[in-house]
Amino acid sequence: MTVFPALPGPLEIEAMKQYEASLRQARCKVALLATPEIKLPGTGAWDYLLISASHARSLPPYALLGMASRTVVVAKDVHSHNDRDWVLNNACTLSTSEFLQSRQNTGKKADMSRIKLLEMLALVADDADTGKLEAIFRQEPKLSYSLLRLVNSAAIAPRNPITSFAQAINLLGRRQLQRWLQLLVYADPNNSQRPNPLLQKAAARGRQLELLAPHLSPHPQVECLEDAAFMVGTFSLLDALLNMSTKEILQQLPLAPVVNDALAEHAGGLGKLLRAIEAAEAGELKQAASTMKALGITSDIYCDAQLASYSWAAKIRPTA
């Protein structure tokens, strides 16, 4: 799919028209990026219409319903759960996922199963013995089931299924176990058949930081840099998941100072790298590019890491 702007620059109009015509002739999918300054096209004029949630909500009633009869409507800049519910109930087939990173004011307490997982992560970080870890799983049997489903996913694809927590430790080792526990925080222990989009997002962000961290300049003097980077990435979405402030979460997690500072204040090389990735995800590309350049990371390195991390995260689909 190729996306065309509704308001191309004066010098680009003719070239855009020719390119659009060539794509249509080749029967390629074409999309229009809507803007409030320009009237919406007729239905069926484009294969896809990309429209911001705020623009969509300003339209007359049923405008999107008519458009959606022959055009796939995709909502973007969907920053709240309320916006997401609205666009999906008003003819938008797809939406972008900015809302995932917003905290909901639901009044609900944090999920205790996930709090238990945070306790377990602290024990793993302190190299606690296996018995203490198994004790937490005995208290929360859903966690044991969720962990086994996750470690048997396509991302690991063990030759023989992993069927017990002790087996998971023996086969994965403490280092890999800690990584899967970090991701398990995002799995839904109450509805294991429903994927949590935050799981894939946290996995991709963690993997991306891990791949980029060795290229930081100056190189951080951090023990197990890649592990620290992965943790910064995966834990950077805990506030949205747990509906708690980052400060509250960090008070319960005895993390290494470099990880704590990166999450709390975007401090140090890992913190700045996290800020750059967050800026890129938010579409603030100039800020992201400037920060990456200051950190010594080229656009090629960034793109390679991004593609590799998305590919890896897409394989994390818990088995039934």
What kind of feature is each model-predicted range?
Residues 1-38, 201:
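Bacterial c-di-GMP phosphodiesterase EAL domain
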Residues 1-5, 28-33, 47-51, 71-76, ...:
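Hydrophobic faces of well-ordered beta-strands that scaffold small-molecule active sites
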Residues 5-10, 36, 41, 60-61, ...:
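Proline-rich intrinsically disordered, low-complexity coils
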Residues 8-11, 56, 79:
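Glycine-/small-residue-rich active-site loops that bind phosphorylated ligands and cofactors
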Residues 17, 37-61, 69, 104-107:
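Bacterial c-di-GMP phosphodiesterase catalytic domain signature
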Residues 22-23, 41-43, 87:
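Generic structural signal for hydrophobic
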Residues 35-41, 79-84:
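Short, acidic/polar
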Residues 58-320:
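Conserved alpha-helical "signature site"
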